[in-house]
C-alpha cells in the first residue's frame, strides 16, 4: 500500500522546507527505535516518515512526486531511500550538522551509530538442549534524550571547530613534509560543544543499567553467537543504537557428551545383564527410554537411539544418541561367590566357551615368540 507523503508528515501540500523539517523532526523523535524498542508499529511509522522526508526535502524529487506520484519516483529511480544508514542520516540535517566540508565532513558531523557490546552467558548442558530464557543486567551508555544525543544544552548547537575549521584534521609540518593529523581541539569531530548538556556533560550519552531478555534456542553449543539488534550502546546525533552480541558457553555434563547434534553416553551394565541380555532404562535428554541389550553383549558395544539427540538449529529434527556399554566387573566378592565363579569358569573351559579367548592369546604368543627366535 502506497502512502501519502504529506499526510504521513501531517503537513499541507504547499508547506515550506522549514515546516517539513520541523514536522519530520517531531515524528522521527517520537517513533525513534531507541525510544520504542520492540515496538514494530513504531518502527514502521519511523520508516514511513523517513521515506516521506527523503522525498519532500528534495525539491527535485518533490516536483516529480507532486506531478506523477509514486510511479514518477519509481520510473526516475529516485524512490530508493537506502539502508538504515541513509534513514538515520537525515538526523544530521535536523540537528544542525549539515552543510559545507564535503561528504567526509557530512559523515563526521552526522549521526553516529552506537558501539556494539559483547556479553558472555553460561548455561547448563540441559538448558542448551531444551532452550532457555535469561534476563541479564547490562550497564551501558544510552542516548541522552535531554539533548537528543547532540551533547549540547537544549537550545544550543555545537560550533564549528576554530582550530580545524570543521575538517577534523590539521596539517603539521615535519621537515619538508606536511602531515595531516587528528585535530586536538575537537578530536576529529569538526565541531566543539560550547554549552554542554547538564545530564550527559557533552557526551551525548548517559550511563544506565537495563535488564535485557535473552532467548536462547534449543540446540545451541559453546561458542554460539546471538545478535540482539539495537541493544548495544546508544547512538549520538540521532544515530541508531549498536547491537549486543551474546556468546554462549555450555557447561559439561557428568553423563552426556555432545558432538554436533549427536549425544554420547557410557552405560554401566552388570556382567550378568551383558551375558544374559535384558531390557534396561536409559536416561536421555528427552526422558527415560528402553534399550534392549542382546545376550552376549560386550563392553564397548554401541547402540543407537534414533531421534534422542540434540534438536537441530536448522529445524531438521533431533540428532541421535549413541549408547556405549560398559560391562562392570564385580568386586568385593565373598568366598562363596568366588567359588561359584571358579566353577562357572571351569564349566566354560570344559565346554569350549573360551575358545575365542584362547585362540586370540595363542595367536599373539606365536607372533611374539616367533619374532624372538
From Swiss-Prot:
Residues 4-69 form the J domain. SUPFAM superfamilies: Chaperone J-domain, DnaJ/Hsp40 cysteine-rich domain, HSP40/DnaJ peptide-binding domain. Zn(2+) 1 binds at residues 144, 147, 197, 200. Its main location: cytoplasm. InterPro entries: DnaJ, DnaJ_C, DnaJ_domain, HSP40/DnaJ_pept-bd, HSP_DnaJ_Cys-rich_dom, HSP_DnaJ_Cys-rich_dom_sf, J_dom_sf. GO terms for cellular component: cytoplasm. Its cofactor is Zn(2+). CDD domains: DnaJ (cd06257), DnaJ_C (cd10747), DnaJ_zf (cd10719). GO terms for biological process: chaperone cofactor-dependent protein refolding; DNA replication; protein refolding; response to heat. Gene3D superfamilies: DnaJ domain, Heat shock protein DnaJ, cysteine-rich domain, Urease metallochaperone UreE, N-terminal domain. Binds 2 Zn(2+) ions per monomer. Disulfide bonds: none annotated. Transmembrane segments: none annotated. Zn(2+) 2 binds at residues 161, 164, 183, 186. Keywords: Chaperone, Cytoplasm, DNA replication, Metal-binding, Repeat, Stress response, Zinc, Zinc-finger. GO terms for molecular function: ATP binding; heat shock protein binding; unfolded protein binding; zinc ion binding. The J domain is necessary and sufficient to stimulate DnaK ATPase activity. Zinc center 1 plays an important role in the autonomous, DnaK-independent chaperone activity of DnaJ. Zinc center 2 is essential for interaction with DnaK and for DnaJ activity. NCBIfam families: DnaJ_bact (TIGR02349), PRK10767.1 (NF008035). Belongs to the DnaJ family. Participates actively in the response to hyperosmotic and heat shock by preventing the aggregation of stress-denatured proteins and by disaggregating proteins, also in an autonomous, DnaK-independent fashion. Unfolded proteins bind initially to DnaJ; upon interaction with the DnaJ-bound protein, DnaK hydrolyzes its bound ATP, resulting in the formation of a stable complex. GrpE releases ADP from DnaK; ATP binding to DnaK triggers the release of the substrate protein, thus completing the reaction cycle. This is Chaperone protein DnaJ. It comes from Desulfotalea psychrophila (strain LSv54 / DSM 12343).
